[in-house]
Design a protein with these regions (language model features):
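N-terminal leader/capping segments at the start of a protein or of a new domain
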Residues: 1-54
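Short loop/turn motifs at secondary-structure junctions and domain boundaries
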Residues: 75-77, 95-96, 122
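Glycine- and acidic-residue-biased ligand/ion/polar-headgroup-sensing regions
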Residues: 89, 100-115
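Extended, aromatic/histidine-rich regions of cofactor-dependent oxidoreductases associated
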Residues: 162, 169-196
C-alpha cells in the first residue's frame, strides 16, 4: 500500500488526538459508519483496543444457545461489519478462513482458545500454533488466516467476543485437519444455526 493510500485510510478514522480516547459500543458503531474507505487490519485492531464496554451496553445483543455459539450483527456497511458472538463452555468454530476478509476480535468476557493452522506441501491442513486469550485481549485475523476459536472454559463461564471484519464476510471456507478438502459456509444464511 502506498503512503498516500495509508494516509487517506487513516484520515477516514478519527482525528489524531481522538485516536486514544476510549470508545463505547455506540461510538465504535458511529466510527465504523463514518468510514469513507476500508479500514486496515491494524486500524480495526486499534479500534477494538479502545473499546470500553459496559455489561448493560452488550446485554440486549447477547443470546446463548446450548448446542452452538451464536452470531448477531451489530453493524454492516459496504466497507466493514461488526458482530457479537456468544459462546457456552466448550463451543468452538469449525476450522475456517474468512475468504479474503481480515479483522480483529476482542474478548469481552471469558477466555478464548485460538488455534492457528497451515497448509502442508500436499495442501492438507495441519496445526501450527495455539494461543490462550483472556478477557480484554484483542487478536487479529489477516489474509490468509486459517484458524479455529472457541470458549476455552471447561466449566460454566460463558464467553462473549466482538468481531470486526473488512470487507464484510460473504463466504467462510471450512477445513478438516489432515485434509485438503475445502467446504463453504455462508454467514448470512438464515438456516445457519449460529445466526441469532
Amino acid at each position: 500500500m502506498s503512503t498516500n493510500a495509508m494516509q487517506t485510510t487513516a484520515r477516514t478514522l478519527t482525528a489524531e488526538p481522538e485516536q486514544t480516547r476510549p470508545l463505547t459500543l455506540a461510538a465504535l458503531t458511529q466510527t465504523l459508519a463514518a468510514l469513507t474507505s476500508a479500514p486496515t487490519q491494524r486500524e480495526l485492531d486499534a479500534l477494538l483496543r479502545r473499546l470500553e464496554l459496559e455489561t448493560e451496553e452488550l446485554r440486549p445483543h447477547l443470546n446463548f444457545k446450548p448446542h452452538t455459539y451464536t452470531r448477531r450483527r451489530l453493524f454492516r456497511s459496504d466497507l466493514c461489519e461488526m458482530l457479537v458472538l456468544c459462546w457456552m463452555p466448550g463451543q468452538r468454530t469449525a476450522i475456517h478462513d474468512h475468504d479474503g476478509s481480515y479483522g480483529a476480535i476482542r474478548i469481552c468476557e471469558g477466555s478464548m482458545a485460538e488455534e492457528i493452522f497451515a497448509l502442508n506441501e500436499a495442501g492438507e491442513v495441519v496445526a501450527a500454533e495455539t494461543h490462550a486469550r483472556a478477557a480484554g485481549e484483542v487478536t487479529g485475523t489477516d489474509v490468509p488466516d486459517i484458524h479455529r476459536i472457541g470458549n476455552a472454559d471447561p466449566g460454566e463461564q460463558t464467553m462473549v467476543t466482538i468481531h470486526v471484519y473488512a470487507p464484510p464476510l460473504r463466504v467462510i471456507n471450512t477445513y478438516q485437519l489432515g485434509s485438503a478438502e475445502v467446504g463453504e459456509c455462508w454467514p448470512d444464511d438464515p438456516a445457519n444455526p449460529a445466526n441469532s
